Amino acid sequence: MTTEHKSGFVAIVGRPNVGKSTLLNRIVGQKIAIMSDKAQTTRNKIQGIYTIPEAQIVFIDTPGIHKPKHRLGDFMVESAYNAMREVDATLFMVSADQKRGKGDDFIIERLKNNNSPVYLIINKIDKVHPDDLLSIIEDYSKQMDFKEIIPISATEGNNFEHLMDVLVEQMPEGPQYFPDDQITDHPEYFIVSELIREKVLLLTRDEIPHSVAVVVDSMKRDENDKVHVQATIIVERDSQKGIIIGKGGKMLKQIGTKARQDIEYLLDDKVYLELWVKVQKDWRDKKIYLQDFGYRKEEY
C-alpha cells in the first residue's frame, strides 16, 4: 500500500525574541532568518521549506507581535496576523526563561479564534530547571486548549525530532510545492540583505537596530565564479551613520567581514562585498521608503 505524500503550511508566532528565527534556521539546516538578542529583528515573513521523502512543510517565521510605534511596526504586526490566517498549524512560541506576560495573553486571545490547531512550543528549556518547566506547562495549560505542548531547545536541538514528527503527522495530503534542495522561497539577494542586517545588529549599539534597513543594489558573478555584492545600509540619523562606519571605517569593515563569511557559506562561493551607509530620515514612517526597502504588503 502506498503512503500519500503530505504537505502544508505552518506559522511560527510569539512575542519578540523568543527564538522563532533560531527554530526556523534549525528546521531548514541553514541560516535564512535573522538572529539577534535584540527584539523585533524579523520584519518580513520568512518562508523556510522542510522536505523529507514523504512530506514537505513550508514554515512562516513572523515578526514578533508587539504594540506598533510607527508604520514599520504596523506592517510587522499585520504580517504576523496574515500568517496565521491560512495555515495548517500554528506554533505559538514562548521562552521558558521569561514569565508569561500581557504580550503572551494578547496573542493567546487572538489564537483562540484560529482555524488551525495551535501547538504551544516552550523554547529555551536548557535554561530552566525541570521543576520550573512543569509549572510553566501548567500555567499555559490553563490559558488555552492547545493541541499539544512541546518543550524544546531550538539552539541545542532538544526534542526537535519529536516536534517535526508531530507536524508531519498533522499535515494534510498534498503535493510537493518546491524542489528537494530549496530551503526558502525568498531570492538570494533578500537573504544576503538579512545577513548583513544581522551583523549590524550584532555589532552596533542599542540605538541602531530598529532604524536600519539593508538594500542589495547588485549581485553579479564574474568569470571566476566570485560573487560581487554591493549593498547599502540605510539609517535615520547622521549619528547612526557615524556609529556604523566607526572610527576610520573600522566598524563598517567588521560588519562587512562577518557578513561576507555568512554570505560565502550561503552561496558556497567566494564573495567580494562592498558596503555603503546612507541616511534616509524617518524612513520607517514613510510608505514609499518601506516599499523601496522591501516591505510590500502584497508580497508578505
From Swiss-Prot:
Segments of this protein annotated with the region G1: 14-21
Region (G5): 152-154
Protein's GO biological process: ribosomal small subunit assembly
Residues in KH type-2 domain copies: 204-281
Residues that hold GTP according to the record: 14-21, 61-65, 123-126
Positions of the UniProt region annotated as G4: 123-126
Chain intervals for the UniProt region annotation (G2): 40-44
Quaternary assembly: Monomer.
Protein name: GTPase Era
Organism classification: Bacteria, Bacillati, Bacillota, Bacilli, Lactobacillales
